Amino acid sequence: NPSADQNQALRFAAEGGHIEIVIALLKDKRTDPNAYQSEALRSAAEYGHVKVVIELLKDKRTNPCSFDNSAIRWAAQYGRTEVVKVLLADKRVDPSANKNEAILLAAENGHLEVIKVLLRDKRVDPNEALLKAKECNRPQIVEFLLLDTRITQKTKNN
């Protein structure tokens, strides 16, 4: 049974980037891609397995917003720019979820390319990310964010 142990087979295959196994498991209707708060998608996003993320999103049962949009937050945290792009192409994904945590994590960890991609979405607020970049001594990110017209004067002065 592929759904045994909260779909452990799918979760491990996704984490390892084993695309063929993921595809085979998703063909079985007993497989639940949302099991364990969509850990399969979160893990694929965290480890940068773009093809696995794409396959999981093709399956209508996959909820990319599960666990407060954790897939995009984890992809941003670990600098997985291509995964962030794929997730943003899905209209269900909210990059501003959980108080703009995706861009905050990208700023904290120095992932400028991820920040550039996230800021294409008008729902993302760069103000707290600027403060986080200052706090974490990320001068390149600070310089980039200061160019964004959404940055308030109050944030600039902090």
Question: Residues of each region from the PLM?
Answer:
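Conserved ankyrin/ankyrin-like repeat signature
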Residues: 20-21, 51-52, 82-83, 113-114, ...
